Amino acid sequence: MAPDDVQQVVDEWIATWTHIRGITAGRVDGWPLVHVAAASRETELVCLDPGVDDFVALMRHVRGDPRAMLTVAARDVGPYLTARRPSGVRVDRDDEALMSATLGDDPIPPLPDEMTFRWDVDGQRITYTLEAGDAVAAVGSVGVLGELATFDAVETMPAFQRRGLGRHVMATLTAQARGRGAVRGVLAASAQGRQLYTSMGWDTRLEMVSLMGE
């Protein structure tokens, strides 16, 4: 059963996210600061519905730094989107959502005949890749932390979309997570991914907006 406390959902997401990526998190002004160390950003400061005034004050941590991200999660991110932003701060993304689900024993859609698959394990990250000849058609990763799983970088390449591959990848990763003891899942979803996950029984818990320095 999904937790009712959205703070718990955020905490679980950060715990599983840092676990699967092998990264760390500290705290700044009482909020988690994730040391992402990725191509897109170096750090991400995550706050849960802090109020507009506090959110504006937190912008100083990313202002002028194109490698720093500030993310707010809330049931309604509208007030944060319209909050005044100083120069040196821009909206990076405003269509993501934090989602959770109880992991069910759902059937895995069959793989198209022309597709092959492979599994790769790198630390806590288990990656499932679909290939058509030499081309990657779809890919996704899962990590398990106790009874929790998070799903990361689930993507179907443009040339292979609208063929149900995303559903196949998610169902396969879910079975892998359940086999490793996971009973619940949490993830951050893009707008496109959100449609797929909703159709597979995932619940939207919070909307998300991310700012970056410039």
Predicted regions located by residue number:
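Conserved acetyl-CoA-binding loop-helix of GNAT-fold acetyltransferases
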Residues: 54-58, 156, 162-179, 199
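A conserved beta-strand-loop-helix scaffold within acyl/acetyltransferase catalytic domains
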Residues: 119-157
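C-terminal "cap" of GNAT-fold acetyltransferases
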Residues: 95-105, 188-191, 210-214
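Acyltransferase donor/substrate-recognition loop-hinge adjacent to the catalytic core
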Residues: 85-126
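Short secondary-structure junctions
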Residues: 20-35, 85-93, 116-117, 203-204
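N-terminal charged segments
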Residues: 1-69, 73-79
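Conserved GNAT acetyl-CoA-binding A-motif
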Residues: 64-74, 177-189
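Conserved active-site alpha-helix within GNAT-family acetyltransferase domains
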Residues: 77-90, 167, 179, 191-208, ...
